[in-house]
Swiss-Prot record:
Annotated stretches, region: Disordered: 736-765
Protein name as catalogued: Probable cleavage and polyadenylation specificity factor subunit 1
Keyword Lipid metabolism attributed: no
Subcellular location: Nucleus
GO cellular component: mRNA cleavage and polyadenylation specificity factor complex; nucleus
Length: 1454
């Protein structure tokens, strides 16, 4: 058996976050970096996101959101990160990342290509540094010096690697020193940081020279130590400069404090300690659990009654530290300083806000805090400083005996103005005390669906009756996951294929395309134009669709395109021969086109209309208001376009035109960019306004820091500095000065309001609305793409051989143009000299058709259309490019470039090749050159703003989301779509109208607003607020069984007295943090409202854990089928070491009852059929052939359910602890906590159960989840483990390595860098494949897909593979590393091989699993690289594309 593994959706959890200048460019501002397992994202803070009027407000408002600017996926998990400025890139921040086991990569964003480039690679892995260990390594830690002098990496916990950043060095040379060489006691490193304010880079280690445990705390405590080590990076010398011993034994984390305070904070589970080399230490204790276990002097804050284990912290400013606890609370730790402000006297600790359970905290721009979470949604918070005054409880006695002479002293006006009534204010200050507090509010949140603990499939919700098809072979379902933890616990409902809610549907024969045009005052559409083969149908939109009786539009011929001008006030219709302009119920103008050839394509963007005729002629019209409103033709023959197009190399047929209105301010001329300091303004007025705004911000900031009196006395310091050194006209210098000042102020009280302090380059749409520029994109038959300015029609950008789809598009230089012209002339001469036969001519025509750009558009996507995306259709594929600012040496041309996005959208469902191996004809219909556009941009559909719908055989929605950039979602549940238009109506707000291909049905629909389409997998998240352990769908009653728990503090201990267990209550003081074992409950959730069904809750006993929850089909005589589906649960009573562990098996059925009034979902009740305590812990359940298979610790029992009782049939002794069972007919796989996996066989005739085979590898890692891989008559077994491996086994008794069948043979092993806890098996998808007969469909369906979800929120699948496809893809996987460089320099084999890496006898064939994440990089290569790589493999490129697309579509599901 061969397999194919691919991760389809990126992780949503966030492990690391950092703030810095990661995007190149002078005016790009600062960004937030997040890394979740393998997914890197870079965000900017955008304060200009428009929020539509709601119930609270009547006007549009602007809110702040995080906007993804860049994203990419690594091959393996990142363990630690740091941010530094390296000498190679002094103007931007670089990212240092560590990987298994001791690898370090330094990466940054490349300015020219806007991709992740690798600056330096360091591998510290060798046998000597390992000291003989092969696993259980300490993860590599990387830290950077605050002054950017060097970085340090902890290697295997025993060595330190130093990376000096020498200014004049071209490369970064590292060296490794053993920690024992620095100091013999330096061992068991818990954490390390660089200290700020030292002359040389100084590393502070937190370590434990002699370890202790909680069990030995009464004998040995206060074992933690710190050591400050100064690093001389020139001489490679180390010197110990600071040591402190006898710190509390629970210390685990260090937080460096920047100067002027300096020093570091040490966080423990119960304590916080501040250490400084020049100041005596001070600390505080947070509970009474530590009484008697430390002699360190600590301030008593035991009344807080909390712990800081698993906490995270970050330094904010002015002696404030934010601390996030494991319960999801945000605390403020203040360093109280002496009157001089230089030394810390004490610590204050208080709760300030409730957040998600934080895993990382990062201070962004002043006043902004990012909370990264692995267990819940990540949040962007804004905080402001509030100062309140209160009277002191004790007032000083006032002095009565005042000197009468002193009162008579007269003060002149200057003294009064300068010093005021100082004495009176002094006395008032004594009577009042100022309290400072931080006020937080949430600005934005990044949704997280991880960690996925359990997963099941359920009935499709939100499924319209029009989409229900009885003949459909493929099932439609929802994927429901149990996500989050604690108060972040949630149910997530996922829909792979978009399912629009159909409002109405009607048959419309002969219709080809449709457009909704014209706007009423409430922004709803007036008309629906439907183009037919030889005519046009006009429908008026109101309460119903009614055919328009008035002759406003042209109905006697088919419509080519329709749109709106003047912001929707004018409706435009373009037919084959004329243009109609309609407004307010009357036709304003009808323009007859002066051409002998019909119009085949049109583009309508306010205020221009561009037309393309069948002979390739371009016509341009502009809407003018003088002397009256009309469309006026622009004389193209008088522009430079005519002379440019007439030249020899440009004299080719035009194949596509489109107009783009740029609101992003990216499309600027390169020459103008240089003269204006990096394109910082747009025009002089805007630049001046920006400078004024920045000066105002800095003035407000200075008032916060110094006060208004300083300005009055000494003048405005900001203005003086800027006037002396930086001219106001120079936008670049002003921005640079602003950034410099803000970075210096981070250590002080520089908290700003949300507007203007984001350090972001986001554009304000209210400011740029008047400066929108228009451009014409023209594609030529020879594969060239050109951009022209409107209305001048000047050539401002050219892309040569666009049909080659390179990874980077740049402007065509004069030299390249001349070279292309000579090559074309040689090719023409060669073709003229050699006569061609008919077959070769057909082949040439097909090749030209494959290279032709059939459609090319630039679409403004994302927030405020700030992300221009170039979309083009080449060779029946949609390619996507993102535009970014870049330098351009050609004067008068645009300073932009395009980078290819890793998305592959294929527009055909059949294979590219015929049975004879030749290119199959195009599926896209082109009649006489006329073809309707497939790319349909829209401003808003439901909750999606500025998206694109691509129609055709595989309809696809494209969303450029703020969450993670470009996402693609297929909408194949209604089959192919031939027409689409956005539609707004009073009854259907922001809906859609589309037309199906097969039945020609017109559907008015809306997308479900509850779902988040910016996620890689559209999801609806239902917050439950409890930890969800199991979720199972019960099909017969259409409800979900959900097992959840909440922690419940307990002071009870159970002991055995006279063979009976008894409770002992241990009284603790009120400041003791009691253990909180989970209290489990079972609820039924209805999919109607996604809330718990009333009166169905089952509570379990204290200390009883639900370990298994399954729906099982058991033999029954009361049903026709002979099987009855029940809900089975297994529990464990764990009362401690003395009490014998027991468990229960509970069998329930869900019955239907009469619902209670006003509670429609209360029509279900749980009826318990069987509930009995067992002699051991019940740890796993499943049904096998109508019987109940039950894991009880190290045994497996099989039961028969009869007469509401369980009768034992057979049992089997296993290894240590069986915790998961999966069955298929009469076989089952059992996962053991320590001994991997076993295959169990049950022989019903003999009532015998036996171990057929098992995984006996000594190096097998502790397993997490298992599932079957089914390929028709063949079965394989999947196993995921704690190190992120996925292993595939076979039962092959005839193979010599299987030892006669006793050993499961390892077919494949791969490490995906994330832990998998949930599998679901689905049958193969056939709807997207062109299959000829039923046998082929059945074979595909029986080749089942195993879908997995990880603890990081990512999804993927494993599929069986035919040997022919495997061999082709295996060769591709071997060679692709030589063509595509991997991010961070990760080697494909090294980073994806199973961990720990060691040769095993049973792993000879561990290469039989194709890594889909690697081989699918082939789809994103240029045409030249694809062809070259395919030639090296001995096949055509279409063979590989067909294989990969077939695998994608078989693994897709509704």
């Amino acid at each position: 058996m061969y397999g194919y593994l691919r991760e389809t959706d990126d992780s949503t959890a966030i492990n690391f976050s950092a703030y810095g200048k990661f995007l190149p460019g002078e005016n790009t501002g600062f960004q937030l970096l997040t890394i979740g397992a393998k997914f890197i994202r870079i965000f900017r803070v955008n304060p200009y996101v428009l929020k539509e009027p709601g119930e609270d407000n009547e006007e549009w408002q602007q809110k702040t959101k995080l906007e993804c600017m860049f994203s990419c996926r690594l091959l393996n998990k990142c363990h630690s990160i740091a941010v530094a400025r390296v000498p190679q890139l002094p103007d931007q921040d670089s990212i240092l990342m560590t990987f298994d086991d001791a690898k370090l990569s330094i990466v940054s964003i490349n300015e020219k290509e806007r991709n992740m480039q690798t600056i330096s690679l360091h591998a510290f892995e060798n046998e000597y540094l390992r000291d003989g260990f092969i696993n259980h390594f300490q993860p590599p830690l990387v830290r950077s010096d605050p002054s950017n002098r060097c970085a340090a990496c902890l290697v295997y916990g025993k060595h330190i690697a130093i990376l000096p950043f020498h200014e004049n060095s071209k490369r970064i040379h590292s060296y490794v020193i053993p920690l024992k060489q620095i100091d013999p006691r330096l061992d068991n490193i818990a954490d390390m940081v660089f200290l700020d304010g030292y002359y040389e880079p100084t590393i502070l280690f937190l370590y434990e020279p002699i370890q202790t445990t909680p069990g030995r705390a009464c004998v040995r405590y206060d074992t933690m130590c710190i050591m400050g080590v100064s690093v001389n990076i020139v001489d490679r010398q180390f010197a110990v400069v600071w040591q402190t011993a006898n710190l509390p034994m629970d210390c685990s984390q260090l937080l460096p404090i920047p100067k002027p305070l300096g020093g570091a904070l040490v966080f423990g589970s119960n304590t916080v300690v501040y250490l400084n080399q020049a100041v005596p230490p001070c600390g505080l204790v947070l509970n009474s659990c530590y009484d008697g276990f430390t002699k360190f002097p600590l301030k008593d804050l035991k009344h807080l009654k909390m712990t800081l284990d698993c906490s995270t912290s970050v330094y904010m400013e002015d002696g404030r530290i934010a601390v996030g606890s494991r319960d999801g609370d945000l605390f403020l730790l203040r360093l109280m300083t002496s009157s001089g402000g230089g030394t810390v006297k004490s610590l204050e600790f208080s709760k300030v806000y409730e957040t998600s359970i934080a895993y990382s905290l990062t201070v962004c721009a002043p006043g902004h805090l990012f909370v990264g979470s692995r267990l819940g949604d990540s949040q962007l918070l804004e905080y402001t400083l509030l100062k309140t005054t209160r009277d002191c409880a004790v007032k000083r006695l006032k002095i009565d005996n005042k000197d009468p002479a002193a009162a008579e002293i007269e003060l002149d006006e200057d003294d009064m103005e300068l010093y005021g009534g100082a004495i009176e204010e002094q006395q008032n200050d004594d009577d009042e005390q100022i309290d400072e507090s931080l006020q937080f509010r949430e600005l934005d949140r990044l949704r997280n669906v991880g960690p996925v603990k359990s997963m099941c499939v359920g009935r499709p919700n939100y499924m319209s009756n029009d989409l229900v098809d009885a003949k459909r072979r493929d099932p439609v379902f929802d994927l429901v996951t149990a996500s989050g933890h604690g108060k972040n616990g949630a149910l997530c409902v996922h829909q792979r294929s978009l399912r629009p809610e159909i409002i109405t549907s009607s048959l419309l024969e002969g219709a080809e395309q449709l457009w909704a045009v014209g706007r009423k005052e409430n922004e709803s559409h007036k008309y629906l134009i439907v183009s037919r083969v030889r005519s046009t149908l006009i429908l008026e939109l109101g309460e119903e669709l009614v055919e328009l009786e008035e002759q406003l539009f042209v109905t006697g011929e088919p419509t080519v395109a329709a749109g709106e001008l003047s912001q929707g006030a004018l409706a435009v219709q373009v037919t084959s021969t004329c243009i109609a302009l309609v407004t307010d119920g009357q036709q304003m103008q009808e323009v007859h086109i002066d051409s002998n050839f019909p119009v085949i394509q049109a583009s309508i963007v306010d205020p221009y209309v561009a037309l393309l005729t069948q002979n390739g002629r371009l016509l341009l019209y502009e809407l003018v208001m003088e002397p009256y409103v009309q469309l006026r033709e622009v004389d193209i023959s008088a522009t430079s376009f005519a002379t440019w197009h007439a030249t020899a190399q440009n004299l080719t047929q035009l194949t596509s035109i489109s107009i783009y209105a740029d609101a992003s301010e990216i499309m600027k001329f390169a020459a103008a960019e240089k003269s204006m300091g990096g394109g910082g303004g747009g025009d002089g007025e805007v630049s001046t306004a920006e400078n004024a705004m920045m000066k105002k911000e800095q003035h407000e900031e200075a008032i916060l820091l110094h006060g208004e009196d300083d300005d009055f006395l000494y003048g405005d310091e900001d203005e003086t500095i800027m006037e002396q050194n930086f001219p106001v006209e120079n936008g670049e210098a002003t921005i640079k000065q602003s950034n410099t000042r803000k970075r210096k102020r981070l250590g002080h009280d520089a908290i700003q309001s949300s507007r203007g302090g984001e350090q972001s380059d986001a554009i304000d749409p209210t400011r740029t609305f008047s400066s929108i520029s228009h451009w014409l994109i023209v594609s030529h038959e020879n594969g060239r793409l050109s951009i022209h300015s409107l209305p001048e029609m000047e050539v401002v950008y050219q892309i040569g051989r666009f049909s080659n789809v390179p990874e980077l598009l740049v402007d065509l230089t004069v030299e390249e143009e001349e070279k292309e012209r000579k090559a074309k002339a040689q090719q023409a001469a060669k073709e003229a000299s050699v006569p061609t036969d008919e077959a070769e001519q057909l082949n040439t025509e097909m090749k030209q058709l494959c290279e032709r750009v059939l459609e090319a558009q630039i679409v403004g996507m994302g927030i405020n259309q700030a992300h221009p995306i170039l979309m083009a259709i080449v060779d029946e594929q949609v390619v996507l490019y993102e535009m970014f600012s870049s330098s351009n040496p050609i004067p008068g041309h645009l300073g932009i470039s395009f980078r290819k996005l890793p998305h592959f959208i294929c527009l055909r469902t059949s294979s590219h090749l015929n049975s004879d191996g030749k290119r199959a004809p195009f599926e896209m219909k082109i009649n006489n050159g006329k073809r309707f556009s497939l790319i349909h941009p829209f401003e808003r559909v439901s909750s999606v703003n500025n998206g694109v719908m691509i129609v055709g055989a595989v309809p696809t929605l494209l969303v450029y989301g703020a969450w993670g950039g470009m996402q693609t979602h297929q909408m194949t549940v209604d089959g192919p779509i031939k027409a689409f238009t956005p539609f707004n109506n009073e009854n259907v707000l922001h809906g859609i109208v589309y037309m199906t291909q097969h039945k020609s049905e017109l559907r008015i629909a809306r997308m479900h607003p509850d779902f988040d389409y910016e996620m890689p997998y559209p999801v609806k998240k239902i917050e439950v607020g409890r930890t969800i352990h199991h979720v199972r769908y019960l099909m017969n009653s259409d409800v979900y069984a959900v097992v959840s728990s909440i922690p419940k503090p307990s002071n009870k201990i159970w002991v055995v007295m006279n063979d009976d267990k008894q409770e002992e209550i241990h009284e603790k003081d009120e400041n003791f943090v009691l253990p909180a074992p989970p209290k489990y409950t079972l609820n039924l959730f209805s999919s109607q409202d996604w809330a718990a069904v009333p009166n169905t809750e089952i509570s379990f006993e204290d200390m009883e854990a639900v370990t298994a929850c399954e729906d099982v089909a058991l033999k029954s005589e009361s049903t026709i089928s002979g099987l009855e589906t029940l809900l089975a649960m297994g529990t464990v009573n764990n009362y401690g070491e003395e009490v014998l562990v027991r468990g229960r098996i509970i069998l329930c059925e869900v019955i239907e009852v009469v619902p209670e009034p006003d509670q429609p979902t209360s029509n279900r009740k749980i009826k318990v059929l069987f509930d009995k305590e067992q002699k051991g812990p019940v740890t796993g359940l499943c049904a096998i052939n109508g019987l109940l298979l039950c894991g009880m610790g190290q045994k497996v029992f099989i039961w028969q359910f009869k007469d509401n009782d369980l009768m034992g049939i057979s049992f089997l002794d296993m290894h240590y602890y069986v915790y998961q069972l999966h069955s298929l007919r009469t076989i089952a796989i059992a996962c053991d906590a320590r001994e991997s996996m076993s295959l169990i066989r049950f022989q019903e005739d003999n009532k015998a159960m036996s171990i057929a085979s098992r995984d006996d590898r000594k190096c097998a890692q502790p397993p997490m989840a298992s599932q079957l891989v089914v390929d028709g008559a063949h079965v394989g077994f999947l196993l995921s483990d704690e190190t992120g491996n996925i292993t595939m086994f076979n039962y092959a008794p005839e193979a010599p390595e299987s030892n006669g069948g006793e050993r499961l043979t390892v077919r494949a092993a791969i490490n995906i860098g994330t832990n998998i806890n949930a599998f679901v098996r689905l049958r193969g998808h056939t709807s997207l494949l062109q299959l000829n007969n039923e046998d082929e469909k059945e074979a595909i369906e029986q080749r089942m897909t195993t879908v997995f979800a990880s603890l990081d929120g990512s999804f993927g699948f494993v599929r069986p593979l035919t040997e022919k496809s495997y061999r082709r893809l295996h060769f591709l996987q071997t060679f692709i590393g030589s063509v595509t460089p991997q991010i961070a320099g990760l080697h494909i084999k090294g980073s994806r091989s199973a961990k720990p890496s060691q040769p095993i006898v049973n792993g000879r064939n561990a290469r039989n699993l194709i890594d889909g994440d690697v081989v699918e990089q082939y789809l994103h290569l240029s045409l030249y690289d694809k062809t070259d790589l395919a030639r090296r493999l001995g096949v055509g490129r279409y063979h590989i594309i067909d294989d990969l697309m077939q695998l994608r579509r078989m693994a897709f599901y509704y």
